[in-house]
Amino acid sequence: MAEQKYRYTLHAVVREEQGKGASRRLRRQGLVPAIIYGGNTEPQAIAIKQDELKKNAKNHSFFSQIINLKIDGQEDQEILVRDVQHHIYKPLFQHFDFQRIVRGQEITATVLLEFVGEERAPGIKTDGGIVSRHMTTVEVICRPSLLPEYIAVDLSEANIGDIITLADLKLPEGVRLVGDMEDEEFAATVVVQISYPQREEQMEDTDTAAADEEGDKEEDADKQE
């Protein structure tokens, strides 16, 4: 079997102490507390460098791709990000939940939608249509080895009024959406649509209506005074 290649690798240490106090001490040292669970193995408390996480997280696919986890003295593990807690106002991670991957067993994961061909779409390039993205990710089920980095949504032939739904997505072989595609309502969920551009007179009407509304509010305020 060929050696698995990973786009992301993390290095961690085992957390001997747990609890809020221990977590605060780790964060002061530039470490982020985390937990690994699943795979018929006991949960394991670990800590990862904040800088290493921030570097990897610059690419959004980090949150949906299989990660190779290295812990000193242990065999490498394959994991997926399951939950992330952020600092309330600082650009820092507070905690990560990871799920162990078991080769051969299907997993559920969030995959990015990548919209391509927009610059060639006649409804956009020629007619000035507006692209409205209703979804940017989808939940999929597949074997770990088949997990795609993203799912492409081709807009190159899109015209004004066109709608792309979940049923229109071209999924890689062995990958399926979480949900019942036999359910017409689910299958018809809108992913992206190309709308008519707003005309100048419509914009003027909108601006006039907003100005009239603001004037009414000022008049009411004057009466109250």
Swiss-Prot record:
Residues 202-225 have a biased composition (Acidic residues). CDD domains: Ribosomal_L25_TL5_CTC. Part of the 50S ribosomal subunit; part of the 5S rRNA/L5/L18/L25 subcomplex. Contacts the 5S rRNA. Binds to the 5S rRNA independently of L5 and L18. Residues 197-225 are annotated as: Disordered. Coiled coil: none annotated. HAMAP family: Ribosomal_bL25 (MF_01336), Ribosomal_bL25_CTC (MF_01334). Signal peptide: none annotated. It comes from Dichelobacter nodosus (strain VCS1703A). It comes from the Bacteria. Belongs to the bacterial ribosomal protein bL25 family. CTC subfamily. The keyword Ribonucleoprotein applies. This is Large ribosomal subunit protein bL25. One of its GO terms (cellular component) is cytosolic large ribosomal subunit.
